[in-house]
């Protein structure tokens, strides 16, 4: 193992992604209980630790793949700056502490959810990536859980329509988001022999499937104003416009990949903000 720096550790835990996971957890908690408590903060910290631990373990599992993909080749394990043993120990330590904090925040139910997320992401999704082009469906199921973790940790009802809609939004957003990102490194993925739909399906079939996912994502967004989830008419109009923007992005998904990706990501952020503002009942003079 070469010299390990703080920057290497940050790259190992993918701190930006882990921070976004923590933010999604905090968002879910605020939707359930719209005022900050220690439980909100503990649940967010727990998912940050879990995400960082999952990332470290994932990079150990996929070190050979990371080495042949330009975007990931500079990660510390493929470069030899962090060894497999050190990466594994750090990942397990972060996951274990994350589980402890999550149990402290939300009790046994939250702990079991946290264990399930790690089991699905590192135990199922990561190995399946080498075997099937639709492994992302498994990964997305785990990736959509952070808002659920936050919601449940603060005592939100598990069968709430709001929770179902938010989980569905996160789930459906991940598919086009990842596929559009993967198009940037298609030749590297081909070299790594990963069976992505972009590579394993005929172009026309892949394009149709990508549009289907965009349309499904748009329908999920349009469900928000269709059901009584928002109090303010202005907020319903804004979310409806977001759904229309996704339908537009579906038409651009193949020809204007970057534009479609930005729209997909921006819509998720916009809907999160709208839901939170509506839940907090923040006065906005425009509406």
Swiss-Prot record:
Protein name, as recorded: Protoheme IX farnesyltransferase
GO terms of biological process kind: heme O biosynthetic process
InterPro entries: Protohaem_IX_farnesylTrfase, UbiA_prenyltransferase, UbiA_sf
Function: Converts heme B (protoheme IX) to heme O by substitution of the vinyl group on carbon 2 of heme B porphyrin ring with a hydroxyethyl farnesyl side group.
A single MF term (Gene Ontology): protoheme IX farnesyltransferase activity
Catalytic activity of the protein: heme b + (2E,6E)-farnesyl diphosphate + H2O = Fe(II)-heme o + diphosphate
Subcellular location(s) per record: Cell inner membrane
Native species: Nitratidesulfovibrio vulgaris (strain ATCC 29579 / DSM 644 / CCUG 34227 / NCIMB 8303 / VKM B-1760 / Hildenborough)
UniProt pathway: Porphyrin-containing compound metabolism; heme O biosynthesis; heme O from protoheme: step 1/1
Pfam families associated with the record: UbiA
UniProt membrane topology term: Multi-pass membrane protein
EC number(s) reported in the record: 2.5.1.141
This protein's record includes keyword Hydrolase: no
Transmembrane segments: 19-39, 100-120, 134-154, 162-182, 212-232, 233-253, 267-287
Keywords, ordered alphabetically: Cell inner membrane, Cell membrane, Heme biosynthesis, Membrane, Transferase, Transmembrane, Transmembrane helix
GO cellular component labels: plasma membrane
Record family assignment: Belongs to the UbiA prenyltransferase family. Protoheme IX farnesyltransferase subfamily.
Chloroplast as UniProt keyword: no
Note, other: Carbon 2 of the heme B porphyrin ring is defined according to the Fischer nomenclature.
